[in-house]
Structure formats: structure tokens, C-alpha cells
């Protein structure tokens, strides 16, 4: 039986990866991280979509104590700002080493569940501003985990070379994915409906617009 664990935030990309995993693995579990983020919206979205997807296990793991370095996602005194501010240089929403922590903890849970595969929704398109979303980082992380285990281990990244437009078109071809995206949460400001101004909201809107598809969140609202 092929098994995998999906690193699942409840956002657009990880929801797409969760439903991709359901098509490609016979048994899928999800792991969601509480890392000190200022709002609960993404955790709630992850719980809702995991239930909708019918995953075998959905673990919610608190790693707040492992991520002391702050960002606008975790520090009450910082504001995520708007897209025009975030598009220049590294955005203040970057949490140093967050993906490294997520992948290592997810790998530990995967091994405990009898799996040698983790799926994550990182994209090389974000690599200029987020160094832990590059293919080079993923390859290095996969090799490090395999060495630490003394065994084969895979990190699958279905979206690594896709643009936001391509990600939307990819999701459209996956059974159940667009319906699930109705419940996903992307907004850095934790707003429902989404603020439409933060970096994450604008990139999501651009992706759906360029794909010529109405965002299911808008249809729901």
C-alpha cells in the first residue's frame, strides 16, 4: 500500500497537493502546524478540508517553541502589509527555517505511520523571496532526512515548477479539488472573506484571473 503524509496548511497550494495525493496514493494523512501564527483561520480550514477529503489521520502539531525568530505572521507588532510592499525584497511574512522544521517533523510522523514520503506545496516561483521553497532546498532536505534515517525517503513537490496560473489549472483537473478550495484559507491577515490586499491574497487572485477561472471562495461568498 502506498502511503504519504501531506504538509497541510489549509491554503490553496496545500489543498491542491492534498487532493493530488489522494489521486496518487492509496492512503493519505495530513499534518498541520501551529507555529505561533496570529490567527486560527488556517487551522480551522485545514480541519474542515481534511475531514472533507477523508484523510486517514490529521495531526495538528504545535511547534511554536521551535521557531523563535519572528515574522509578520507571528509577531503581533508587525503587519503583513499589502502586495506593493511585499513585492520588493524578502517579505516580512517569511518565517526563518519554518519549512525545514515542518518537513523534519512531518517526516518523523510519516515514519511512525509506516510511510517514507512527505508531500508539500512549495513552489520554485516563490524562491526569490522565500529560500526554503526552492528545489535546491527540497533536494537537500530530502537527502538529509534519508541520511538521518539510513533509508530511502521522498519529498514530493507537485507544484515546484508551476506558476500560480498553472497551479489553478492543475487543481481544476483534480477530482474534488475545486470544491475543497472553497473552504481554503490564504489571507495573511486572517480575514474571512479574504482582505484582497496582502501578498498572498493578490497572488491567489492573479492566479485565478490569469487562468480564467472564478475563485471558489468568491463563489461561496
Predicted regions located by residue number:
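ATP-dependent adenylation/nucleotidyltransferase module used to activate substrates
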Residues: 1-177
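Local cysteine-cluster metal-coordination motifs and their immediate loop/turn environment
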Residues: 104, 186-206
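Glycine-rich nucleotide phosphate-binding loop and flanking beta-alpha elements
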Residues: 126, 208-209
Amino acid at each position: 500500500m502506498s502511503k504519504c503524509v501531506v504538509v497541510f496548511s489549509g491554503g490553496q497550494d496545500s489543498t491542491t497537493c492534498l487532493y493530488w495525493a489522494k489521486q496518487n496514493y492509496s492512503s493519505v494523512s495530513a499534518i498541520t502546524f501551529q507555529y505561533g501564527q496570529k490567527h486560527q483561520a488556517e487551522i480551522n480550514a485545514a480541519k474542515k478540508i481534511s475531514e472533507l477529503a477523508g484523510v486517514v489521520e490529521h495531526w495538528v502539531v504545535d511547534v511554536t517553541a521551535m521557531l523563535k525568530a519572528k515574522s509578520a505572521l507571528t509577531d503581533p507588532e508587525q503587519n503583513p502589509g499589502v502586495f506593493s510592499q511585499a513585492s520588493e525584497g524578502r517579505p516580512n511574512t517569511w518565517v526563518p527555517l519554518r519549512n525545514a522544521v515542518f518537513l523534519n517533523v512531518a517526516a518523523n510522523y510519516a515514519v511512525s505511520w509506516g510511510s517514507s514520503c512527505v508531500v508539500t506545496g512549495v513552489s520554485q516561483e516563490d524562491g526569490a523571496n522565500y529560500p526554503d521553497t526552492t528545489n535546491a532546498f527540497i533536494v537537500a532536505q530530502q537527502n538529509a532526512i534519508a541520511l538521518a534515517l539510513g533509508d530511502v525517503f521522498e519529498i514530493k513537490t507537485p507544484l515546484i515548477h508551476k506558476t500560480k496560473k498553472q497551479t489553478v489549472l492543475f487543481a481544476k483537473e483534480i477530482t474534488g479539488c475545486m470544491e475543497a478550495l472553497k473552504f481554503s484559507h490564504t489571507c495573511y491577515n486572517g480575514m474571512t472573506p479574504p482582505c484582497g490586499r496582502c501578498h498572498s491574497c493578490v497572488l491567489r487572485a492573479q492566479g485565478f484571473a490569469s487562468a480564467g477561472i472564478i475563485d471558489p471562495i468568491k463563489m461561496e461568498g
